[in-house]
Amino acid sequence: MNAQLDNQGRLRHFLTTEGLPRPLLNQILDTAESFTGVIGKSVKKVPLLRGRTVINLFFEPSTRTRTTFELAATRLSADVLNIDVAVSSQSKGESLLDMLRNLEAMQCDAFVVRHGDSGTAEFIARHVRPGVSVLNAGDGRHAHPTQAMLDMFTIRQHKGDFEPLRVAIVGDILHSRVARSQIHALNGLGAGEVRVIAPRTLLPRDVETLGVRVFHDMQAGLRDVDVVMMLRLQRERMRGALLPSEGEYFKLYGLTEEKLSVAHPDAIIMHPGPINRGVEMNSAVADGPRSVILQQVTNGIAVRMALMSMLLGRAGGGEDA
């Protein structure tokens, strides 16, 4: 059984999109849909998690992810604590497990964890007491499942059924936890074809085992696609000369209107952020009519509300606070 699920097949933790059954993936998207109305109200709160406590443990910097997790929890009426790891007891030599035990003793209900090492969220999930949930906000190169689900939600809003879709993921696949989670989610939801487009130096050796078609040429890879998902070049994770220069990368793999002309006329453009303009795409594409990048940010709140409600409370957004 998937370690994220309880013995009745319900979410206990949310650590990865890999291996999740299609009905559960759709339930997450359906639940997120129920919260979109809440986000649009003047009073953006429901009382589902009143009395619950969520602790954000971010060992890596983040703007969008941390902010939307905090907004999601507060809009469900939970109490939120943000731990500044740089000045926490861990910076004084305390182990991760000891830190976890002390925070658990404060009777929290969930940890939202971002860490530079793959597997950290799963490690914490294995050691928390029963009744405490862990949400993975990104761990090393391994996974970023909530980003993937907000991407799936955005795609469904624009395209509906996943089965006829051709989706291209472009850029630094090798270092991207987002790409892995996107691929697992797209395949889990039955997308017609998932493509990855990147130079050989930015592809993992086992990429084809993930159920994707590999392209090294942008024009060939983008032909007739319905969704283009661009990725950030993760210079901070690169070791060695994987690229000749950012200018050369943009020439070959940066998204422009000219390169986009071979995609389906209604193709949407996505990016998990932050965007490096002039490297991954130009401003005409990023700010153009087919870009849904800011909608992805908005949808992050609804999707994270959905996941917290499924883990900690009653799913659905029908009540006012």
Swiss-Prot record:
Pathway: Pyrimidine metabolism; UMP biosynthesis via de novo pathway; (S)-dihydroorotate from bicarbonate: step 2/3. It is an enzyme of class 2 (transferase). Coiled coil: none annotated. One of its GO terms (biological process) is amino acid metabolic process. Carbamoyl phosphate binds at residues 64-65, 114, 144, 147, 273-274. HAMAP family: Asp_carb_tr. Catalyzes the condensation of carbamoyl phosphate and aspartate to form carbamoyl aspartate and inorganic phosphate, the committed step in the de novo pyrimidine nucleotide biosynthesis pathway. This is Aspartate carbamoyltransferase catalytic subunit.
